[in-house]
Curated annotation (Swiss-Prot):
Its main location: cytoplasm. Belongs to the D-isomer specific 2-hydroxyacid dehydrogenase family. PdxB subfamily. It is an enzyme of class 1 (oxidoreductase). The gene is pdxB. It holds the Pfam family 2-Hacid_dh_C. This is Erythronate-4-phosphate dehydrogenase. Catalyzes the oxidation of erythronate-4-phosphate to 3-hydroxy-2-oxo-4-phosphonooxybutanoate. It comes from Bacteroides thetaiotaomicron (strain ATCC 29148 / DSM 2079 / JCM 5827 / CCUG 10774 / NCTC 10582 / VPI-5482 / E50). Its EC number is 1.1.1.290. The lineage of its organism: Bacteria, Pseudomonadati, Bacteroidota, Bacteroidia, Bacteroidales. Pathway: Cofactor biosynthesis; pyridoxine 5'-phosphate biosynthesis; pyridoxine 5'-phosphate from D-erythrose 4-phosphate: step 2/5.
Length: 348
């Protein structure tokens, strides 16, 4: 079996070579029809667009994307061509929650906010949104949830409307998949009308997909003081992001909220597992991220400890200094571990 693998997917080489007769590694943007022509499977990230142009006439039978999102896969074409695929739902949910937790700590400190006086609106309550809700509850915030597909299945006891979130929330964070059309369309969900409906000058956070927020509408909301701040990890037209928006957001990062080593290891494992299931392979492998360079953290309180584990301002400063390096900063992202990798001392 021959597998073509995105060369930025970590911790995969040894395991992949246990299940493949031949494994070829290439940059995600360089996957071509010629490269994939005689491959049985692909393991990709969002940079590889799997569509007719890439896949037609190839031997590819299965695509594993080491990501939660799958809008870079033309699922209709794959269905027609008999190509199956799998994503990695929930793989990096704890990583995104860590990013938002640290971002909120920075924001509340800079803006003198008391968490128990704040209301957060979480739009999209899947694997990530559910973990963010737990973070907010631990902070003592009031939590409002919006998830139309879940509300239709489960009823509206748990969920609320976008209108109520716009009226009552001090923090609004997006965790929806990107749907460009249909009943659950999320493309430009936050448009000019949405921003004009906001009542409390909230901080707006987007770690889902860039196209969920209309860039010009967000810029207008910042310029007109409709929102107090923005924390943006995902952008329209990546990697050619809007430089003016980058300059004006509180925190702007190169699509790395889910890039903890733990989340990457989960995604790698899930991708390999899906290939083994599809091809009926039996393989034993371990996907273990490296230990942090300083696993012992000394801090006077939990908030200090969390920011020592991960401070998104560092990632933001790098991108703001070199926006032209968006792809490089994302592809060569330094080791970041989640809380379970650390021991904390000094908290009384």
């Amino acid at each position: 079996m021959k597998i073509i693998i995105d060369d930025k997917i970590p911790y995969i080489k040894e395991a992949a070579e246990k299940i493949a007769d031949e494994a070829i590694y290439a940059p995600g943007k360089d996957f071509t029809r010629e490269l994939v022509q005689d491959a049985d499977a692909l393991i990709i990230r969002t940079r590889t667009h799997c569509n007719r142009e890439l896949l037609e006439g190839s031997k590819v039978k299965f695509i594993a994307t080491a990501t939660i999102g799958f809008d870079h896969i033309d699922t209709e074409y794959c269905k027609q061509a008999g190509i199956e695929w799998a994503n990695a739902p929930g793989c990096n949910s704890a990583s995104v929650a860590q990013y938002i937790q640290s971002s909120l700590l920075i924001w509340k400190s800079l803006r003198n906010k008391k968490p128990d006086e704040l209301t957060i609106g979480i739009i999209g309550v899947g694997n990530v949104g559910s973990k963010v809700a737990k973070v907010a509850q631990d902070f003592g915030m009031r939590v409002l949830l919006n998830d139309l597909p879940r509300e239709e299945k489960e009823g509206n006891i748990t969920f609320t409307s976008l209108e109520k979130i716009a009226e009552e929330c001090d923090i609004i964070t997006f965790h929806v998949p990107l749907y460009k059309e249909g009943k659950y369309k999320t493309y430009h969900l936050a448009d000019g009308n949405f921003f004009r409906s906001l009542q409390r000058k909230p901080v707006v956070i987007n770690t889902s997909r860039g196209e969920v927020i209309e860039t010009n509408a967000l810029l207008e909301a910042i310029n007109n003081g409709i929102i107090s701040d923005a924390v943006i990890d995902v952008w329209e037209h990546e990697p050619e992001i809007n430089r003016e928006l980058l300059e004006k957001v509180l925190i702007g990062t190169p699509h790395i909220a889910g890039y903890s080593a733990d989340g990457k290891a989960n995604a790698t494992r899930m991708s390999l597992d899906s290939i083994c299931r599809f091809f009926h392979l039996s393989a034993t492998y371990e996907i273990t991220p490296p230990a942090p360079s300083s696993p012992l953290i000394e801090a006077k309180d939990r908030e200090e400890a969390l920011l020592k584990m991960y401070n998104p301002i560092e990632d933001s400063n790098r991108l703001k200094s070199h926006p032209e390096l968006f792809e490089t900063l994302r592809g060569d992202y330094p080791l970041r571990r989640e809380e379970k990798a650390y021991n904390i001392i000094g908290i009384k």
